[in-house]
Design a protein with these regions (language model features):
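Bacterial N-terminal signal peptides
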Residues: 9-18
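Bacterial N-terminal signal peptides that target proteins for export
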Residues: 1-10
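Central antiparallel beta-sheet cores of small beta-barrel/beta-sandwich binding domains
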Residues: 24-121
Length: 121
């Protein structure tokens, strides 16, 4: 095996665990707000659970609980969808320095809402 191949394999072996660790979120109840398009911010909680390869997120706001789908945790982003009233909404939240997430949620009609999530204490 050539030295350059060995070096590349070594670098990848070190980088892979770091990238996997960066994709973890703290399980538990996160707090924050949901701001619908043209609406006021609503206090919310977000129940985040992981078991093996399964990730679940439940949004609780305005007396309703909605399960998220298509959840993807990346190093710097959290992506998911949810369907309030049957209309699909796609969210892209960015991880902040304080480990919170915030970002936009877009519906099929082009309406934009905002979600902020702060990790459990």
């Amino acid at each position: 095996m050539r030295a350059s191949h060995r070096m590349l394999i070594g670098v990848l072996a070190l980088a892979l665990p770091a990238s996997l660790a960066a994709q973890k979120m703290t399980p538990g109840t996160w707090t924050g707000t949901v701001t619908p398009p043209d609406g006021q911010a609503i206090e919310a909680t977000f129940d985040f659970r992981q078991s093996g390869d399964t990730t679940k997120l439940t949004l609780n706001a305005g007396g309703r609980a909605i399960e998220a789908s298509d959840i993807k945790v990346e190093a710097t982003r959290l992506l998911f969808s949810f369907s309030p009233g049957g209309a699909s909404v796609r969210c892209t939240l960015v991880r902040r320095d304080d480990k919170s997430y915030s970002g936009d949620c877009l519906d099929a009609q082009g309406g934009k809402g905002v979600i902020t999530m702060k990790p459990p204490a």
